[in-house]
Amino acid sequence: MGLAVGVVVLAVVLSAVFILPKAVSEFYYNPNEAAGQYEEMTTTRMDLDLSVYSELFLPGNHRDQVSAVSRGYGEYDIVIPQTSSWTGKFTSVSGRLVRGKLTLYDNNVLSRPIMQFYLPGDEDAWAAWEVDENGKETKMDTEARKEASIQDSKETIADYNDNDWYLAYVSLNDIMDYKDFIEWFQNLSNQKELEWGALWCAVHTEDEDGYCVEPNIGFCPLPSGMSVSWDREKYPYLSLLDNSDLSHVAEANDEETMQTHFTSMLSYIQDHDDILSMMGQTTDSPNRYQDMINFVQKNGLKIHGFAVSAKKKALLELYKEDVVSYIQTTPQN
């Protein structure tokens, strides 16, 4: 009798130690799930999720590799390395994923930038009010405030170190077709022999009422990072670096491919929104990404701004261009 009880107890203990942790994990987000496979190379779910998310929302800070060590019961130790850098500095981010909730030990590294694009014709973006000693509010001269902000930006850039890298958010005076934009950017680069880092295009989309859906969303037309695998039939050109076709790299001026790439990323993030909540974004608008897809498919790629890694010389040259409206900058990570 005692032996039988002992066997049962041992079975329960072994189950709790070896089976239960894995069984519980099956109910929650698994960062190590295979999202794609090519030969011996596996792309994990969180590799792909973070690659798409960071390209859409984190200009100059693309991440496409995640190390996830399972602790059982839906818990994982997470490390997100930085695999490319224009400054020579590499910043990895560590954290813990507990049953679908991600806690990063340094939230600032992968947080969405506080900088923004100023949309052409949106004068409300420059609106501000002054309050006198009696509490009376007076609207400031919008155009004067805009000009003062531009002058402050130019003076800030003029004081920069010549050899340091900066991430610039560049607003355009007019919304441009992607074909015209990339042609202008490439010509500027060639004529001025400017040194650029990663280019990121801010795509303009509108909802049915004509309002911009999301000003700070876009894509990188010049691929960099790790080649990945995924469901290519469902999400064509989800990545511009394909494990199965490393010999072919899409050209930046291939507008059709770039449009497919961008809309595939929107479709993917719409279908795999776990990464949005993990990164602290709300998902309370079910039609948000579909509205963007519909607009791009109907109107093509429209660009209202771009982000780029650059040095002082290139930033000063940008301000000489008629298409450029305003530049916000921050030191490059």
Predicted regions and their residues:
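Hydrophobic membrane-insertion alpha-helices, especially the h-region
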Residues: 3-19
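Short amphipathic alpha-helices in soluble, non-transmembrane regions
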Residues: 182-190, 318-323
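Extracytoplasmic/periplasmic/luminal assembly and interaction segments
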Residues: 51-114
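Short extracytoplasmic/periplasmic juxtamembrane "stem" segments immediately C-terminal to an N-terminal membrane anchor
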Residues: 30-49
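Short, compositionally biased low-complexity segments enriched in polar/charged residues
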Residues: 105-162
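Short acidic amphipathic segments
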Residues: 309, 315-330
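Acidic, glycine-rich flexible loop segments
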Residues: 284-303
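Low-complexity, serine/threonine/proline-enriched polar segments
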Residues: 94, 100-101, 201-281
